[in-house]
A protein has these predicted regions:
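Hydrophobic/aromatic residues located in beta-strands of well-ordered beta-sheets
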Residues: 5-7, 111, 173
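Short beta-strand/loop segments at the ligand-binding rim of alpha/beta enzyme cores
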Residues: 108-115
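Conserved phosphate/ATP/ADP-binding segment of small-molecule kinases
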Residues: 107, 121-190
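Anion (oxyanion) recognition and catalysis
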Residues: 25, 102-106, 136
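Residue-level signal for inorganic ion chemistry
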Residues: 81, 114, 141-145
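Conserved N-terminal subdomain of the carbohydrate kinase-like
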Residues: 4-85
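Active-site beta-loop-alpha junctions enriched in small/polar residues
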Residues: 62, 86, 116-120, 147, ...
Length: 190
């Protein structure tokens, strides 16, 4: 499509990390903003779809103490910054995530937030609520699954999720439901 892409992340200096970096290079995605940490292993997440196209996950991780030690790419107006998952909530990475989102807002980039909140973190939902709200405040677009919001808020009704949890912070909301519908909510559409 001719659009320049930057990927900000981290990986270990191991076979998994090398596969990831080579895949990125093979697909013309620069690796300049991927922190390759020398101690620790590349995290691996495996997703298995059930008969309803809902994913079940297994996570393997062994992180070093120093994380996300990268320089951010140049960000310009109307660039799209995608943040999400526990990565955007992790207290260890929070300062770097906030730095990125502050730059994005200052430069008038579009922040797209996908909570991707998994069942493995549902017991932390209350503790993570202030960070989730902060991400919603930075977001120009929020996109999540019914499953995400169920684990975050215990709610499965799209309209209630939008009105009670999203709209105040971000007026543009997309909600998926596995193989079912995709719902769009805005100030003008409900």
């Amino acid at each position: 499509m001719g659009v320049n892409v930057c990927f900000i992340s981290e990986t270990g200096n191991d076979h998994v990390g090398n596969i990831i970096l080579q895949f990125m290079r093979d697909n013309h995605i620069p690796t300049d903003h991927v922190n390759v940490f020398p101690d620790g292993k590349s995290p691996v997440s495996l997703a298995f779809l059930n008969e309803h196209s809902d994913a079940e996950y297994i996570f393997y991780k062994d992180y070093p103490k120093q994380r996300l030690d990268v320089l951010f790419p140049s960000i310009n107006e109307d660039d799209i910054i995608v943040i999400g998952s526990y990565y955007a909530l992790n207290p260890v990475l929070r300062d770097k995530i906030l730095e990125l989102m502050d730059i994005a807002k200052e430069k008038r980039a579009i922040v797209y937030y996908d909570p991707n909140f998994r069942s493995s973190h549902k017991n932390e939902a209350m503790k993570l609520a202030p960070t989730i709200i902060e991400n919603l405040e930075y977001a120009d677009i929020v996109r999540g699954s019914l499953e995400d919001f169920y684990y975050m808020y215990g709610i499965k009704d799209v309209e209630k999720i939008y009105k009670d949890k999203i709209k105040f912070y971000c007026p543009l909301f997309l909600c998926t439901a596995g193989a079912e519908r995709i719902s769009l909510r805005t100030n003008a559409i409900s």
